[in-house]
Design a protein with these regions (language model features):
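Short acidic/His-enriched helical or mixed secondary-structure segments at domain edges of catalytic enzymes
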Residues: 32, 39, 75, 79-87, ...
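Bilobed periplasmic-binding protein/Venus flytrap-like ligand-binding cleft at the lobe interface
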Residues: 60-72, 119-124
Length: 221
């Protein structure tokens, strides 16, 4: 190694990701596919501006906004559940990778178009009126509890610390950042995210095979 100069000191190499600029237009506004599932599923996606590296603040703020709009404490979630329009697992999440960010809503429903319209109406209502202050505080407390709860388990704690470290932050910094988020921040963010012109919808219909499998299991029992 020394003979070939492999032991000599070299300047640190920096990995550079070559990402093509992502347009804010949609590749497709609607798509339907069939899969081996027992009940119809749907997904709504909103294309957002990519978040800079290490910007966990915006990601956390988006998550709090979703909690206010369709979380378990929101009036929309209660209505959808009480009227049987979707399953208990319906909810929203933030998906961010280098050069890309989107906000997703997924669930099971026999009336996905009704759910979509109710969701869009609720987004517009909250955009105009502002997030419910009490629900926002409850969502912040819930998020804070999740951060602390993960520290009680070795595996969860290690995973959480690694995720934050890869973004150049610590758990303590995340907790401080969470404490600094306000309902006014959410109101301001809602003016430029979750825009209907950047929304795409995916319908996933049963292909019939999953129903047959369930019938076979019931027969065996």
């Amino acid at each position: 190694c020394a003979r070939h100069g492999l032991m000599d000191e070299r300047p640190a190499e920096k990995v550079e990701r070559l990402l093509r600029p992502e347009p804010m237009t949609l590749a497709a506004a609607e798509k339907t596919i069939a899969m081996p599932i027992a009940k119809s599923c749907f997904g709504l996606g909103f294309k957002e501006e990519p978040l800079p590296f290490g910007d966990l603040r915006s990601e956390m703020l988006y998550e709090l906004i979703l909690c206010c709009i369709c979380g378990g404490m929101s009036p929309l979630y209660r209505r959808l559940y009480d009227e049987g329009l979707t399953n208990p697992g319906f909810g929203g999440e933030v998906l961010r990778v280098d050069g890309c960010c989107c906000i997703l809503f997924t669930g099971e429903s026999d009336r996905p178009d009704t759910v979509r319209q109710l969701l869009l109406d609720e987004i517009e209502r909250v955009r105009k009126e502002g997030v419910d202050r009490e629900i926002f505080t409850l969502c912040k407390n819930e998020k804070y509890g999740q951060l602390i709860e993960n520290l009680e388990n070795v595996e969860d704690s290690a995973s959480q610390m690694a995720d934050f470290a890869l973004a150049g932050q610590t758990v303590a910094q995340q907790i401080t950042m969470l404490a600094g988020l306000t309902a006014e921040d959410a109101d301001a963010a809602l003016q430029h995210i979750l825009r209907p012109e950047r929304m795409a919808v995916m319908y996933i219909e049963p292909d019939g095979t999953a129903v047959e499998d369930e019938a076979e299991e019931e027969t065996e029992e």
